[in-house]
Amino acid sequence: MAQYSPQRFSMLPTVVKNLLIINLIVFLATMVLEKYGFLLITNMCALNPIGSGRFRIWQLLTYMFMHANFEHLFFNMFALWMFGYVIENFWGSRRFLFYYLVCGVGAGLCNLLVPGWDITVGASGAVYGILLAFGMMFPEERIYLYFLVPIKAKWFVIGYAVIELLCGVTGTAAGVAHFAHLGGMIFGFLLILYWRKHPFSKF
């Protein structure tokens, strides 16, 4: 894979910063509009099941910029920053943004295959793709679980993937799009493999 490292390492690189800002603005705008009864933004931008009659192709992109509540937004954005700034510095902004969007859209596509859900919102699928990238790029790096227990990134990522699979299969933690999370990781994994085989690709 072609590797890129900027001369100056940034703790808040361009794409990560802009994604944080956009997600916050969309969340606040949605909250204000819904308070006054304007539900159209949610109906049109959240990811709806294909058979619902509400599905629109652009929802595969827009759903990842919407969040159910502040806690949902906070943890997604914290994880995006925590792992994303490292990956963006390592890959460069253009490749990072392309990867992020592919993982988010891929997560949405996988979720469309799962029956029995209403709407899906959130950047979690894309963020899980970023987590997967961190584990593949820096497998021996130690992550402090709950800020206390050190665990290598590769085991951290594998553990999360197993948990998501088990929760998805057993129906644990209903209301969480486990297969979307897995979809983001799968699409990220395939894209990284492609880049490794084609190191001089455009992205």
Where are these regions (language model features)?
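A detector for small-residue-rich transmembrane helices and their helix-helix packing motifs
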Residues: 1-203
